[in-house]
């Protein structure tokens, strides 16, 4: 799992976010591919605007990251030192055999 969050201030927040999403993601599917998702985290930690940015080419692989993000639903509020009201995240879900 890799992600792009530009120049985000707080690496510990990112670590916790990845851990929370990974707990809901079914990583082993017997196929190889990468699905890229984009979503927004609101100031209160709510995950919104979940969408597929790039398909793996396999619906079974593409549906799992969305499911993981929906199940995660919310995270800790964005850190006080982060100045924006939202954080846009581009996350790759990498499936390997």
Which role fits each region the language model picked out?
Residues 1-2, 52:
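Short linear capping/connector segments at secondary-structure termini
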Residues 2, 15, 35-36, 40, ...:
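Residue-identity detector for threonine
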Residues 3-8, 23-31, 66-97:
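Short, positively biased Gly/Pro-containing turn/loop motifs at secondary-structure boundaries
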Residues 7-15, 56-63:
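Soluble non-cytosolic domains of exported or imported proteins
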Residues 13, 50-51, 61, 90, ...:
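Solvent-exposed, well-ordered amphipathic alpha-helical segments
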Residues 16, 20-24:
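Solvent-exposed, charged/polar functional surfaces in cytosolic regulatory/catalytic domains
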Residues 30-59, 66-69:
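Short tight loops/turns at secondary-structure junctions
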